[in-house]
């Protein structure tokens, strides 16, 4: 009897020891854009716990943040990101064009691989001293604007395209008048930072400018961290549906053997837990149950999509942001 128990105990110890031996310590690198720092600081430990409970493997996720365009360039230049979570599809397309990501990447996850969305709003100082109410308020004489540089920042490109969409609607789809409106707006930009978080810091911490054109999530974060006694959010009548996108970096995950966990990391963003974390960090979730739960956090406004107004990112980039494009033309002083 005791001999049998001894054999059984030995077998259990051996099984436990083998599980310890087989458990892995995995590292992932998520190269992301500027304002997602807080989101992934909260999401990463939740995913790590989920993955360890599911597989026994421990995972450490490292983060890199910066302007979305600059981050894409860093991956193109050799930074070994397992996943990219960038501000817009064009930046991931740029990596795919160099062969590191499958060109059909956008079809691999739901909602065109955009697990959460945002839009573009205005952050103003308490009392709204310049009386900013909509896009046309931004071109009033004496209004100093802070927005990042579309050459380096994904959020800045969304800002620019949101302004252009308003210009079209306000001028009966007249593209020349829309161009004149956006030109007038950029003539009043005081600082063009390289990324969205830098622009927020310029406005919030350095006290420069009357209005910050910002991601909605970034504006809400500023309000909730610094207080409604310092800043207010102005939601314009119309803005763009901003869709930050995500992908595994195929070349890297196949080299490092991390495809399974990298894919699971992105898929978990669509889970109820992932969607809840997105909403808590002021991103608009996709899950309808979570949308309903947080409906009071996100004002209703008219939203247009990139495809409805600009065709696709390739067209928008070529016309507006490429060297010699419309942005270069209108930003000359």
Protein language model annotation of sequence segments:
Residues 1-9:
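Bacterial N-terminal signal peptides that target proteins for export
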Residues 24-153, 295, 302:
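N-terminal segment of the mature folded domain
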Residues 31-33, 124-126, 144-171, 185-189, ...:
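Short beta-strand->loop
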Residues 120-128, 243-260, 277-281:
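A bilobed periplasmic-binding-protein/Venus flytrap-type ligand-binding module shared by bacterial periplasmic
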Residues 127-133, 152, 165-173, 252-259:
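Short helix-loop capping/hinge motifs at secondary-structure junctions, enriched
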Residues 171-237:
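Ligand-binding pocket segment of bilobal, Venus flytrap-like solute-binding proteins
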Residues 253-333:
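Extracellular/periplasmic juxtamembrane helices and adjacent flexible linkers that interface
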């Amino acid at each position: 009897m005791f001999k049998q128990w001894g054999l059984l105990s030995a077998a259990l110890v051996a099984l436990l020891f083998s599980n310890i031996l087989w458990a892995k310590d995995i590292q992932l690198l998520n190269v992301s854009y500027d304002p997602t720092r807080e989101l992934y600081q909260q999401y990463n430990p939740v995913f790590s716990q989920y993955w360890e409970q599911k597989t026994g493997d421990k995972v450490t996720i490292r983060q890199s943040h910066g302007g979305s365009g600059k981050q894409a360039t860093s991956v193109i230049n050799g930074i070994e990101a397992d996943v990219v979570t960038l501000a817009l599809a064009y930046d991931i397309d740029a990596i795919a064009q160099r062969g590191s990501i499958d060109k059909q990447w956008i079809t691999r996850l739901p909602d065109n691989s955009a697990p959460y969305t945002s839009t573009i709003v205005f952050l103003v100082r308490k009392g709204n001293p310049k009386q900013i109410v909509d896009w046309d308020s931004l071109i009033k004489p004496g209004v100093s604007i802070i927005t990042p540089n579309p050459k380096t920042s994904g959020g800045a490109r969304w800002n620019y395209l949101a302004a252009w969409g308003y210009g079209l609607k306000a001028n009966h789809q007249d593209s020349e008048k829309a161009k004149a409106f956006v030109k007038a707006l950029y003539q009043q930009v005081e600082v063009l930072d390289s990324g969205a978080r830098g622009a927020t810091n310029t406005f919030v911490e350095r006290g420069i400018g009357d209005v910050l054109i910002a991601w909605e999530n970034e504006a809400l974060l500023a309000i909730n961290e610094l207080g409604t006694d310092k800043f207010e959010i102005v939601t314009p009548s119309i803005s763009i549906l901003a869709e930050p996108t995500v992908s595994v970096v195929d070349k890297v995950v196949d080299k490092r053997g991390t495809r399974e966990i990298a894919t699971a990391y992105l898929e978990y963003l669509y889970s109820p837990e992932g969607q809840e974390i997105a909403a808590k960090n002021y991103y608009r979730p996709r899950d309808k149950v979570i949308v309903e739960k947080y409906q009071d956090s996100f004002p209703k406004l008219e939203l247009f999509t990139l495809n409805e107004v600009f065709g696709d990112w390739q067209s928008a980039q070529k016309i507006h942001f490429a060297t010699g494009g419309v942005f270069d033309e209108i930003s000359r002083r």
